[in-house]
Amino acid sequence: MSRRGDWVYENNGGTCVAIAGADYCVVAADTRLSVGYNILTRDHSKICELADKCALASSGFQGDIKALHKNLAARELLYQHQHNKRMSCPAMAQLLSNTLYYKRFFPYYAFNVLGGLDSEGKGCVFTYDAVGSYERTGYSAQGTGSALIMPVLDNQLKSPSPLLLPARDAVTPLSETEAVDLVKDVFASATERDIYTGDKLEIVVINKAGTKREYIDLRKD
């Protein structure tokens, strides 16, 4: 019989969302870090800016998440030295997949969503499972509140399926401002039902002009 002592992971909660538009990408996550019914900190960023116009948001076990982010940052720095340019967002998406798959027999307990701009300046979102399987979509949510948020995003966005032929761009029809407002609304709703999501919302908006961050307050109970 399995015992709790055999389980080496801890889920520290939190929720991550990314939305891709025609010329922008929004990556957002709450800042609560918790274990069970205990809040460890109310100001923990789950978003890491890695490559050129690219941000990774992760939920799960923070020990593994920190190790994963550090690994990817080191690989991206090595790429810069070797190629004299920053890694693109699709290239980072493939690197993340390879890194997760490499650890598949003792996986990083991290559930990731990567967002940014591709080589054509279009928004792109890549969503993952724990062992590196991924796909490019118009939007995604990961973490403890994802089951509450994804139905709302499905209803509001209806991004084209990557399985449709002929292929269509997996971007959402909303403007940048509308996408940010939608992210605020879904997080405000999720915090009413998910005790592991809350405190503050960190929003990273990526477009051709660069990257900007915004913070808003969420429920703190």
UniProtKB/Swiss-Prot annotation:
InterPro entries: Ntn_hydrolases_N, Proteasome_bsu_CS, Proteasome_sua/b, Proteasome_suB-type. PROSITE patterns: PROTEASOME_BETA_1, PROTEASOME_BETA_2. Keywords: Cytoplasm, Nucleus, Proteasome. One of its GO terms (biological process) is proteasome-mediated ubiquitin-dependent protein catabolic process. It is found in: Cytoplasm; Nucleus. GO terms for cellular component: cytosol; nucleus; proteasome core complex, beta-subunit complex. Its main location: cytoplasm. The keyword Thylakoid does not apply. Belongs to the peptidase T1B family. The 26S proteasome consists of a 20S proteasome core and two 19S regulatory subunits. The 20S proteasome core is composed of 28 subunits that are arranged in four stacked rings, resulting in a barrel-shaped structure. The two end rings are each formed by seven alpha subunits, and the two central rings are each formed by seven beta subunits. The catalytic chamber with the active sites is on the inside of the barrel. Non-catalytic component of the proteasome, a multicatalytic proteinase complex which is characterized by its ability to cleave peptides with Arg, Phe, Tyr, Leu, and Glu adjacent to the leaving group at neutral or slightly basic pH. The proteasome has an ATP-dependent proteolytic activity. This is Proteasome subunit beta type-1. It comes from Oryza sativa subsp. japonica.
